[in-house]
Amino acid sequence: MKQSIRDKLEHLAGRLAELDRELSSEDATRDMNAFRDLSRERAELEPVVALYGAYRQAEQDCATARELLDDPEMQELGRSELEAGEARIAALDGDLQRALLPRDPNDERNLFLEIRAGTGGDEAALFAGDLLRMYSRYAERQRWRVEIVSSNPSDLGGYKEVIARIVGAGAYSRLKFESGGHRVQRIPVTETQGRIHTSACTVAVMPEADELAAVEINPADLRIDTFRASGAGGQHINKTDSAVRITHLPTGLVVECQDDRSQHRNKAQAMAVLAARLNDAQLRARQSAEAATRRSLIGSGDRSERIRTYNFPQGRVTDHRINLTLYKLDAVMQGELDELLAALVLEHQAEQLAALAEEGL
């Protein structure tokens, strides 16, 4: 282990001990906001320090095993213990390097999932509905909550555009690499000749801002229009101007919400989506700059990039960024995304480790 990494781990172990003292003091709960911040910091540090403790124990075990090598009667046991200890050290060293990687401050946030039908007309809209169902079922497996914020249904089912809010611990960290172009190859329900068509959708995953105040939005930059809602919502909703359209004039971003009967709630939802989009635009600009420097593919922020193909005749799904193909399309469409998402996280961590190595850290 590099001395710089060991020094950092020693510092974190000392900080954890300091936090334990602060949290156990009589004054700890006088300021509940500070108490929550300290508790959150402790929860982040504890697993890293525990790994470091296991690493130091493995080092001690290896030192003890080397002493046994000097005793002819204990050499075989010593070699066995040393081999096991060195294997533990190698594994823990990798775990510790990953644990020390820079954390994305958005990882624990809720998110807005935006799916837009692209090329392919009605078939693309149907696929947008399939993608929403796929992500919703994955969210259910994680015990997350899915709320439809805005939707524009197509005539044959599915969506021309749909925005959902996904609420749950670590939601953004799991799904943040899903942004990009998703392509489907299958025989559409409207196809009478049995020909395979190719359609596409664009997915955007945006972290929810903690508060609207966290994103600077000048009210003078907004044009807010109200109109009568259409589509699902019942007769009552069509009698009032409950739907809201907000245009951010400097960027041209437009958000519509009409799924609630309350104009006030539709406006609040639209403002939340607008804040997430503005925040996400800044995030993608940073990611794009980093990707240009590191030649990164994962998390590059490029929405125009085709990231995945779903081939129904072959029952396969291919993620083009990491050249991963799984012949379990049915399971994936039912929300079994863990294998795909885990592979993307590992690739991202490998890129981060390579970047740190280049910087000499």
Curated annotation (Swiss-Prot):
Keywords: Cytoplasm, Methylation, Protein biosynthesis. SMART domains: PCRF. It comes from the Bacteria. The modification N5-methylglutamine is found at Q235. GO terms for molecular function: translation release factor activity, codon specific. Gene3D superfamilies: 3.30.160.20, 3.30.70.1660, 6.10.140.1950. The keyword Cytoplasm applies. GO terms for cellular component: cytoplasm. Pfam families: PCRF (PF03462), RF-1 (PF00472). It is found in: Cytoplasm. Methylated by PrmC. Methylation increases the termination efficiency of RF1. Belongs to the prokaryotic/mitochondrial release factor family. PANTHER family: LD18447P (PTHR43804:SF7). Peptide chain release factor 1 directs the termination of translation in response to the peptide chain termination codons UAG and UAA. This is Peptide chain release factor 1. It comes from Azoarcus sp. (strain BH72).
